[in-house]
């Protein structure tokens, strides 16, 4: 394969991995530990 193809595949995989990790952090098991500043506000 050409270098440009390998770089494109690597960057695409990196983007997909980062997106998956962000979704897991937002909606998965670790999301229970996140605080919600809107619920903490008393108004």
UniProtKB/Swiss-Prot annotation:
Superkingdom of origin: Eukaryota
Membrane topology note: Single-pass membrane protein
Transmembrane intervals: 7-29
Keyword line: Chloroplast, Membrane, Plastid, Thylakoid, Transmembrane, Transmembrane helix
Keyword Transmembrane helix: yes
Lineage per the UniProt record: Eukaryota, Viridiplantae, Streptophyta, Embryophyta, Tracheophyta
Biological function: May play a role in photosystem I and II biogenesis.
Compartment(s) where it occurs, according to its Swiss-Prot or TrEMBL record: Plastid, Chloroplast thylakoid membrane
Stated name of the protein: Protein PsbN
Family in the record: Belongs to the PsbN family.
GO cellular component: a single term: chloroplast thylakoid membrane
Gene Ontology process terms (BP): photosynthesis
Gene for this chain: psbN
InterPro entries (UniProt xref): PSII_PsbN
């Amino acid at each position: 394969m050409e270098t440009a193809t390998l770089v494109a595949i690597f960057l695409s995989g990196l983007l997909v991995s980062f997106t998956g990790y962000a979704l897991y952090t937002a909606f998965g098991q670790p999301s229970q530990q996140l605080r919600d500043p809107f619920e903490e506000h008393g108004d």
